[in-house]
């Protein structure tokens, strides 16, 4: 089993956990929680595909959770928390404040992360509630720990950011693409929605719900289905739709994994990063699988960075496609079923 650098660092301290009831959360990227010897293990994932993949590897599905927020019930009877720091500090604070608000006093917490992700800011960020100390470091990762001395007050609504675009209200949580500002690529794609769009529309990787809200702004009769594998994104999309009095079906899905209908239009601003690394897998899978979910007059319309060459895949899977809009940074592609 290949372990991430963060998990390798925790492994060096495995003796600490043999008699402990351990709760794993955060940016877990491997199967290490299954191999660490503990008295009891619980795990919470925020991404649909991570949870499903993990459940396939174990007999006892009760230890694996897929919840937006940690609850006291979920974390009860655990005396140690192992938290994997994500790439975004605001997401880490959001998740850790939630955890600290639910955890009993004197619960021990271990935080591990890559130096480049901002994990070194954790002691200052959390000093009101935990006195954290560095206990180990290796291969550009750091492990810090401490005891929870005071419970945090956590209110979900306090972490939402609100963005405005063309009188639309866009709601965003930490860890969701477009949290700090509406992405320029998404705005470029949204600018192509000005002509009236009808029929069924699938929004892949819906994030904050910006694309769906923009489309419904111009085409209120369109029937939207929004999918994402991130629980935070789905919550944001629901808040965005509600804030603008729009309707849409919110579905937990890793690309097409939970999609069973055909659509007249598929829209997306697909990610090309996996954590801190560039990764084109999602773009490739989206293009390769699109025709299965399009009607015979259907269309795939997406935006991506102009340095990403999509021509080979579009030529392979679609009879005709066009670049319908572009800037110095982005291109919007339009591909037709036939």
Swiss-Prot record:
It comes from the Bacteria. This is Ribosomal RNA small subunit methyltransferase C. Its EC number is 2.1.1.172. GO terms for molecular function: 16S rRNA (guanine(1207)-N(2))-methyltransferase activity; nucleic acid binding. It is found in: Cytoplasm. The lineage of its organism: Bacteria, Pseudomonadati, Pseudomonadota, Gammaproteobacteria, Enterobacterales. Specifically methylates the guanine in position 1207 of 16S rRNA in the 30S particle. Keywords: Cytoplasm, Methyltransferase, rRNA processing, S-adenosyl-L-methionine, Transferase. Belongs to the methyltransferase superfamily. RsmC family. Pfam families: MTS, MTS_N. GO terms for cellular component: cytoplasm. It catalyses: guanosine(1207) in 16S rRNA + S-adenosyl-L-methionine = N(2)-methylguanosine(1207) in 16S rRNA + S-adenosyl-L-homocysteine + H(+). The gene is rsmC. Monomer.
